[in-house]
UniProtKB/Swiss-Prot annotation:
This is CRISPR-associated endoribonuclease Cas2. It comes from Campylobacter jejuni subsp. jejuni serotype O:2 (strain ATCC 700819 / NCTC 11168). Mg(2+) binds at residue 14. It is an enzyme of class 3 (hydrolase). The keyword Ribonucleoprotein does not apply.
Amino acid sequence: MIEDKFMRVLLMFDVPTKSKKEQKLASKFRNNLIKLGYFMLQFSVYMRICKGLSSAKSSIENVKKILPPYGNVRALIITEKQFDKMELLLGGIVFNEKVNNETNLTLFDIDSHGEFKYKNSNNEEIQINKKQEKYHQQNLFEF
């Protein structure tokens, strides 16, 4: 039921950035969030799309391991339906939201031969061209 639904983890944070050391810690925290799969929704609000509640909770546990020593960090888990009800009062949809939406997610499964089978968010299989085309640059100097 709820494990089959896409969930969104919203992280909202305020961390001090007055000294050089605080700026470095804040930057390190943001970079670690990106490494964990979060993307910026707006300043100091990051989001990650997870498949199911347990994955969302696990994602929050991973964030707890990288918290800066000072500041205020909050996490909120919402369903895709709740996220769609969000009202945009001012401004527009940012590039990160367009790229990281539910319809652009690709999931994968492993078949009986150990090969990856890619699926979209509707669990439909996607065909991937496994052959890599080789491109050769022409010689700049002909002798």
